[in-house]
Regions:
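Post-Walker A helix-loop "phosphate-sensing" segment adjacent to the P-loop in P-loop NTPases
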Residues: 29-37
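Walker A/P-loop
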Residues: 21
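ATP-dependent small-molecule kinase phosphotransfer cores
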Residues: 41-100, 106-110
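Pre-Walker A (Motif I) flank of P-loop NTPase domains
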Residues: 5-10
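NTP-dependent small-molecule kinase module
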Residues: 2-4, 135, 139-143, 157-192
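ATP-binding Walker
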Residues: 18
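A glycine- and Lys/Arg-enriched "phosphate-lid" helix/loop adjacent to the NTP-binding pocket
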Residues: 43-48, 71, 94-99, 104-106, ...
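P-loop (Walker A) phosphate-binding loop of NTP-binding proteins
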Residues: 13-15
Length: 192
């Protein structure tokens, strides 16, 4: 259960392309008490991504070393790349009494849930439909046809995990979905 005396840890998860990263950025821009957890990854940076801001881009060898050192709260292999949230980055955020915003998949959320000391509120974001998700993936122009096909195959496996979340929202309109998330934040922070 949520503890209003500890920093809130808001988890946003969704199938790839449903809008969790866009929503995460909107939350951070609208509420400076939130800091986005910057994950480590072994994938190559996309255009306009900045190391240390969007992700900590590391080699597979470095990632495996961090795993052996038990440096992560959560980690997963997704589409052949590793992702993980380091304990040190979360501790740095909460030390400043800021709330933490996680932009992670269901596997990461499941692993975070094992740490009872974390003040988690979990929100699963759905696209309006599978067809709309495919349109979004094509429109964002970040993946080739094969990658989009893999993401669409993963969609059905991803959405079964929505039952493990505190809230499930449909992102049919970014502003409406964002306002719903703000309502959830207000409820759990008891801010007006």
């Amino acid at each position: 259960m949520n503890n209003p005396n500890k920093p809130l840890m808001l988890v946003l998860s969704s199938p790839s392309g449903a809008g969790k990263t866009t929503l995460s950025k909107k939350i951070q821009q609208s509420d400076n008490s939130f800091e986005i957890s910057v994950s480590h990854t072994t994938r190559k940076p996309r255009a306009n991504e900045v190391d240390g801001l969007d992700y900590h881009f590391v080699s597979k060898e470095k990632f495996k070393t961090l795993l052996k050192e038990n440096a992560f709260y959560e980690h997963a292999e997704i589409f052949g790349n590793y992702y993980g949230t380091s304990k040190s980055s979360i501790n740095k955020i909460t030390k400043n009494n800021h709330n933490v915003l996680f932009d992670i998949d269901w596997q990461g959320s499941e692993q975070l849930s094992r740490f009872k000391e974390l003040n988690l509120v979990k929100v699963f974001i759905l696209p309006p439909s599978k067809e709309e998700l495919e349109k979004r993936l094509i429109a964002r122009n970040q993946d080739d046809k094969e990658a989009i096909k893999r993401r669409m195959l993963a969609y059905s496996k991803d959405i079964v995990h929505q039952k493990d979340y505190d809230y499930v929202l449909v992102n049919d309109n970014v502003e409406n979905c964002f306002n719903n998330i703000k309502g959830i934040i207000l409820k759990h922070l008891k801010r007006i």
